[in-house]
């Protein structure tokens, strides 16, 4: 482990393992609809960063464990801060799908 790894947070693969062992967890992909259609993690919910306000309509329980990712980690970091401002209490940034090593799906 490198010094800066401490500040980086969870790797997406580690984050997904943690999510799978968390009851009621939701995986949110904040990439654009086009990016999501090209390839996404099975079971993920696409809420693009610029539509994140709609999360309240789709996930009403603010204590739901949310695991957030994007392509490289920049948008997911922004999304985590925004979701916390909306009142969600259990939000984890798991970084970018470009480090993901599992199955992917195509299409919306």
Regions from the PLM with identified roles:
Residues 1-25, 33-64, 74-108:
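Rhodanese-like catalytic fold shared by cysteine-dependent sulfurtransferases
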Residues 29:
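N-terminal glycine-rich beta->alpha transition that marks the start or flank
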Residues 69:
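Short, surface-exposed ligand- or partner-binding patches at beta-edge/loop junctions that are enriched
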């Amino acid at each position: 482990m490198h010094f800066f790894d401490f500040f980086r947070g969870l790797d997406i693969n580690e984050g997904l393992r943690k999510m799978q062992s968390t009851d009621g967890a939701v995986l949110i992909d904040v990439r654009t609809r086009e990016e999501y259609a090209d390839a996404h993690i099975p079971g993920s919910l696409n809420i693009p960063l610029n539509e994140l306000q709609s999360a309240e309509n789709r996930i009403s329980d603010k204590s739901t464990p949310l695991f957030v990712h994007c392509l490289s980690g920049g948008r997911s970091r922004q999304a985590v801060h925004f979701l916390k401002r909306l009142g969600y209490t259990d939000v984890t940034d798991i970084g970018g799908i470009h480090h993901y090593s599992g199955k992917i799906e195509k299409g919306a």
